[in-house]
Amino acid sequence: MGSKLKFAHLHQHTQFSLLDGAAKLQDLLKWVKETTPEDPALAMTDHGNLFGAVEFYKKATAMGVKPIIGYEAYVAAESRFDRKRGKGLDGGYFHLTLLAKDFTGYQNLVRLASRAYLEGFYEKPRIDREILREHAQGLIALSGCLGAEIPQFILQDRLDLAEARLNEDLSIFGDRFFIEIQNHGLPEQKKVNQVLKEFARKYGLGMVATNDGHYVRKEDARAHEVLLAIQSKTTLDDPERWRFPCDEFYVKTPEEMRAMLPEAEWGDEPFDNTVEIARMCDVDLPIGDKMVYRIPRFPLPEGRTEAQYLRELTFLGLLRRYPDRITEAFYREVLRLLGTMPPHGDERALAEALARVEEKAWEELRKRLPPLEGVREWTAEAILHRALYELSVIERMGFPGYFLIVQDYINWARGHGVSVGPGRGSAAGSLVAYAVGITNIDPLRFGLLFERFLNPERVSMPDIDTDFSDRERDRVIQYVRERYGEDKVAQIGTFGSLASKAALKDVARVYGIPHKKAEELAKLIPVQFGKPKPLQEAIQVVPELRAEMEKDERIRQVIEVAMRLEGLNRHASVHAAGVVIAAEPLTDLVPLMRDQEGRPVTQYDMGAVEALGLLKMDFLGLRTLTFLDEARRIVKESKGVELDYDRLPLDDPKTFELLSRGETKGVFQLESGGMTATVRGLKPRRLEDIIALVSLYRPGPMEHIPTYIRRHHGQEPVSYAEFPHAEKYLRPILDETYGIPVYQEQIMQIASQVAGYSLGEADLLRRAMGKKRVEEMQKHRERFVRGAKERGVPEEEANRLFDMLEAFANYGFNKSHAAAYSLLSYQTAYVKAHYPVEFMAALLSVERHDSDKVAEYIRDARALGIPVLPPDVNRSGFDFKVVGEEILFGLSAVKNVGEMAARAILEERERGGPFKSLGDFLKRLPEQVVNKRALESLVKAGALDAFGDRARLLASLEPLLRWAAETRERGRSGLVGLFAEVEEPPLVEASPLDEITMLRYEKEALGIYVSGHPVLRYPGLREVASCTIEELSEFVRELPGKPKVLLSGMVEEVVRKPTRSGGMMARFTLSDETGALEVVVFGRAYEGVSPKLKEDIPLLVLAEVEKGEELRVLAQAVWTLEEVLEAPKALEVEVDHALLDEKGVARLKSLLDEHPGSLPVYLRVLGPFGEALFALREVRVGEEALGLLEAEGYRAYLVPDREVFLQGNGGGPKEEVVPF
């Protein structure tokens, strides 16, 4: 439907006019190209921002549409600094359409959009005419839509003010100012357009036809209307909601535009001018082939270049990293070989002298140094050669400044008490990075490759991401701001979009669909890799969704509208890690806004910032580093030992013993159930085992873990029989991982050793394999086979080896990253092995806001024999605290108390000594500081137990709060000296809390049960259970198939949801004093189980256990405590295994035979390594046997008969022998 009429849309909103523009860039540009195929052009003019400018520019250019970067500004009625509503439209701001004519115009748009946010934000980001005049060069201005100032004055019949404003705009823009004419069929436009036409004639101004597009096609109007209702939080039933007056705000064809502004009335001028303006606008953004890296200048010591200073720091660093090999004497000898007299002075003088040596001299020396390919031993000469090679690549690619900047902020952080990770990603493969302190793991010891990080065959900006303690990360960003200038550093923006589930729920709300129904619909959308599938795909694969659309017309509309809105941007926010550092003020190139704390943030996202060649860094907050800080502090406080993580021995037997036992709870990367079992099976002996394990423990390579473990234990030989001619090359590379390719670096080394690739070329091969580029892969195969044949590997074997590498490339892991992160795993395990109490206290402190984690770690502490005590206002600290060999809850972990109140309690205790009573506590801490809700939580948590029984304390809060307030008031008014002080009233009498209530209160206040677990307070439940939750995996391990077990516990967190087949399912957490697990129930079992699923009640659960990497527990039936206690009884007899010799068995049998009856009998045998339960199938006794057995010294008791429950109300097979 292409048109030959010339026209360009110059006023178009996109998805970056958040919750207002419904035009997705791809759809928009495709439609523009379709409707104006000859010289298509389009202006992007989003409301008050430039969020999408770079993405729009790139996509438009790629699709053959000329991009015009614009901006619909909000102009303040008076000053941008005004913070009061004026009389103008929308509270004192008006619209104005601005287009960038050239790169200067683009820069001025950036500055205006930035200052609107940084200086003029009040409800909207506003500019004013002062800065408009300041930044008008290179801009074309259109007079605007109905919301602009001139049209508003016309509508108010204030033509003198309209003309005055027109003259002011002319004084700013001159012949770059045009009259904007729009016609959406609105009566207001008809009135305005006639006056605008007269102004154009009077002042000789060009007129321009625009359409204020907010969506792409006319049929998108309904979806746009819904989008506006999402923005305004209204529904379609609300007559007062904000909406557009008609459905004409779409991207019209040239013919439709001319129909709205007939030629007889308007002529060709408004249309021809759009084409003329499109021709005039020619912004050439420095992206793609024109992009240059914009690395800021690092502040250098006098007389140094960036390359020299990086060399100097590297040579200094090598002395400190390898003192046994790189010595001052070695450096003096190197200088002599270079023909330079070594200077007098310290190591810095030597490093400076080496740094000043010309590159040509180094090149000559490198020819005499041992080659780097296949280095077996890292001698001083080899280390120097590797460093020189890396430096030459870094210099040739132009990145010394990059390394200097990164090492500067990392070393500043370390020097100012901010914990920094040992490395992240491929940067750990660089010796230079290690020498200058960027990374903290030795790349030579672990065989890490520089080319995996910085490839001399492929010029691209290095990417060094850094982990900092998540509590201290912001300090480092602030340092960078101060170092390079507040105007040159900002965090990077990002955009949250309407994913399928969110879009569906938002649209459903607007249509008035009940919240519960909307949630049900959203839950039907499958989630893959953590992301919900698009609605279009979901409809195809989920028949329930299709059925809902067919049976309910409103739901069909909701889903269809949601599909149109899906993928639109919903909000702007701050990227979790990205920081940009610029050489010049950022607003020369990138628009800025502010986050909620007032800090500058780029309006562009990460991709746009990188596309412009700006230096982007990732400053990540890693909680493990915060944990290690906390552990070091607690160990120092508790044991007087100063932990230095950089000096820990990496072969500590105690650490590897802990890992081999599977005690990995809280150990970085190793604490999941499946990983724990794998670590226990592997029994690692060296750090390299951990590196391999975290690399293999991912979908795909996991299948090789059993082989790795067997070979690790010598149960299976390492064989290279499949590649007999290549074995001599493969063995040195793969022996470390028992012949199994694990790392990407191994691909590179094999290509290098077997086929003669340089490591840089080998990295290109790795990338090609990962991206499956067919043509490129064929070229590489030919090259690989040719090189292998030259090294004695036959063609057929070389092809097989290439096939193996190609298959492996899909799951090979980055060894540099694995090594750096495995070092953190080792460090956390070391702390747990040597300081378990301090380890658990630190872990609990950093996870105090996650009650599930706290509960899990408290159970682990108790399993290690470490008591965790409730909080105490006279003993607790802010966080969890070590007292002897026990852990005391921190006050900040008590719900409703908050950090400020916790600190106030500690400060008052420090100032006035321990609290003597509840009254003393209340008198010293006013209710404004510690409110009644916080006080109730403190009592329920046990933090005030020293002052009395919890029931009495709760009952006394009201009268004692009144007494405390009156006492403080008397003190303020000076009455205390005149009259005797009113004594503290005694605690109110109240019945003590029963144990169940007390435990429930503890969970309410602390998120967990501390003094015990309610399940132990319900006699009968535990006795029937097959095992505890903690024992479950061990219990079912040797049982065949999908064993059935009985589990008892408290029900927590019940979630019910529909299944794809139209039924219902539920998930719930079952907890006992040893742990908690998730139980799933669906199918026929759901109807019987669901009514009994209520939170905080005890249940007995018959479950089928599916064994795998993680156990899956499926409920078949459940019983309440009452049902359990009412069930038929059995007799249980406890007996020590030592008494079950021939004589003991005969004695017990004769006692049981004396009183025959109907009760089944179970024998619980207590042994040195646990206990076992046996059903005596042929024996039935009467209740009288109980007394006889007790009289004879046996421990015997009546319990509910397990067989009743194992049958699941008739739903399960009867076991011949029941091993509980």
Swiss-Prot record:
Pfam families membership: DNA_pol3_alpha, DNA_pol3_finger, HHH_6, PHP
Subcellular location: Cytoplasm
Keyword Transferase: yes
SMART domains xref list: POLIIIAc (SM00481)
GO BP term, pick one: DNA replication
Catalyzed reactions: DNA(n) + a 2'-deoxyribonucleoside 5'-triphosphate = DNA(n+1) + diphosphate
Record-given protein name: DNA polymerase III subunit alpha
Origin organism lineage: Bacteria, Thermotogati, Deinococcota, Deinococci, Thermales
Gene expressing this chain: dnaE
